[in-house]
């Protein structure tokens, strides 16, 4: 017998069969190692995004830009921050407790303050530029540089009432739900020619399929008045709830979803919940807004737009505010080169396109409503001719910081001429 046999007796187990506890411990260790190997890089990625921002190349977001809203269909998550990185820009977005981008503005208006509420879509939201570069912030700075006159305001505040993907219906609902609480002295609506008419019409967007709509629409009744269709998005389910929590709280998850899965086409499991407007992609083509021969659906879309703008004006005026309309043009309306890319070498004559047509339509609506109207095409074209461009991003199609600066200056002049604001 080996001399060490008495010192180390054999284990009383069946030969060739490891103990049950040992097997469990082995598997627990293996699972722990796998989880550690998976989680440690994610935790490191989470920490690096929070400390350094978008340090990795590529196009992605480190947070969620929009969440579902029971009244507007969608809006910004409150008290949320994220980075947005694209080929053309990188921006940091911070929302306040009310869901607006930028600093918090108290609801109660301080004495001596003149407030301007700006309603609009992604051009007001302006996620393509930094907070101080947005036209609403530049406008605020321009106005506050001129305070001090006898009997005038001691401060101007421009209140953010914009969100990407909104149409005039959502802007009206925001005015009623939140905007009027700020006691604005003036309400400006920034109307984007490119898609606001289509956003206002369920016929243009979804062929009238109400069951696909998950944002609010106003639709005509037989008597010509408008009926509000409330949003009815599908419930997200368990996986949807988990994903929404991760989108709100994990930079790494947002990076993986927006920067990896989306590119691989593997992020559509929850697409119905994430979709902002509808359960299917809106069908209207933005270029049709330039067509001078209106089909029935476009004629209806313009009529709905006319009625909605009147409702916004009435709501503002009834609560003691003045109201103005600002036309935000497309890149093709400002740049001749961009217009040729849309309409062809003949400028759209053969296709029946006129890039000034939507402007004339909106100007007629403003005249009917007795509403001061500013068309931003002339100042933007003049600035482009003077070499101040680029005013729009080529791919993203929204204003650059230079475009926002031109808009702010033009709106400032408009306010002085119409209401002596800032003079």
Put a short name on every predicted segment.
Residues 2-115, 130, 181-185, 198-201, ...:
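N-terminal secretory targeting modules
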Residues 8, 133, 153, 192-365, ...:
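Serine-dependent acyl-ester chemistry module
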Residues 46, 121, 171, 187, ...:
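Generic structural signal for small/hydrophobic residues in well-ordered secondary structure
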Residues 54-151, 276-278, 283, 291, ...:
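Membrane/wall-proximal cationic-aromatic binding patches
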Residues 115-119, 159, 187:
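Conserved beta-strand elements of the Class I
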Residues 151-180:
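A conserved hydrophobic secondary-structure block that centers on an alpha-helix together
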Residues 168, 172, 302, 306, ...:
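Short, amphipathic alpha-helical "lid/cap" segments that border enzyme active or binding sites
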Residues 372, 393-423:
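Histidine-centered active-site loop/cap adjacent to the catalytic His
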């Amino acid at each position: 017998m080996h001399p060490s046999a008495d010192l180390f007796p054999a284990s009383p187990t069946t030969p060739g069969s490891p103990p049950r506890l040992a097997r469990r411990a082995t598997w627990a260790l293996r699972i722990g190692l796998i989880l550690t190997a998976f989680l440690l890089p994610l935790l490191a990625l989470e920490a690096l995004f929070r400390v350094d921002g978008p340090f990795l190349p590529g196009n992605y977001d480190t947070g969620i830009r929009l969440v579902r809203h029971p009244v507007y269909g969608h809006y910004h998550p409150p008290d949320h921050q994220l980075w947005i990185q694209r080929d053309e820009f990188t921006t940091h977005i911070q929302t306040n407790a009310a869901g607006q981008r930028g600093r918090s503005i108290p609801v109660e208006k301080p004495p001596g303050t003149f407030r301007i509420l700006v309603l609009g879509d992604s051009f007001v939201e302006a996620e393509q530029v930094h907070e101080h570069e947005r036209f609403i912030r530049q406008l605020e700075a321009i106005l506050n540089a001129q305070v001090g006159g006898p009997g005038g305001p001691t401060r101007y505040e421009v209140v953010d009432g914009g969100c990407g993907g909104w149409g005039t219906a959502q802007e009206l609902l925001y005015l009623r739900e939140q905007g009027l609480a700020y006691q604005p002295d003036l309400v400006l609506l920034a109307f984007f020619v490119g898609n606001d008419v289509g956003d206002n019409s369920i016929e243009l967007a979804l062929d009238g399929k109400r069951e696909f709509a998950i944002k609010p629409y106003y639709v005509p009744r037989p008597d010509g008045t408008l009926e509000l269709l409330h949003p009815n998005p599908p419930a997200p389910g368990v996986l949807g709830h988990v994903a929404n929590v991760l989108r709100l709280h994990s930079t790494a998850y947002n990076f993986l979803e927006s920067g990896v899965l989306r590119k691989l086409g593997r992020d559509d499991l929850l697409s119905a919940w994430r979709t902002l407007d509808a359960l299917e992609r809106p069908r209207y083509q933005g270029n049709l807004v330039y067509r001078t021969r209106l089909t029935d659906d476009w004629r209806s879309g313009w009529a709905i737009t006319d009625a909605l703008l009147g409702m916004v004006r009435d709501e503002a005026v009834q609560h003691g505010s003045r109201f103005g309309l600002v036309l935000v043009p497309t890149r093709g309306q400002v740049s001749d080169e961009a217009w040729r890319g849309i309409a062809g070498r003949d400028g759209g004559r053969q296709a029946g396109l006129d890039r000034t047509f939507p402007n004339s339509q909106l100007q007629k609506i403003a005249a009917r409503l007795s509403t001061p109207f500013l068309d931003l095409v002339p100042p933007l074209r003049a600035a482009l001719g003077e070499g101040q461009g680029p005013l729009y991003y080529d791919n993203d199609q929204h204003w650059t910081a230079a475009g926002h600066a031109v808009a702010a200056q033009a709106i400032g002049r408009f306010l002085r001429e119409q209401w002596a604001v800032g003079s």
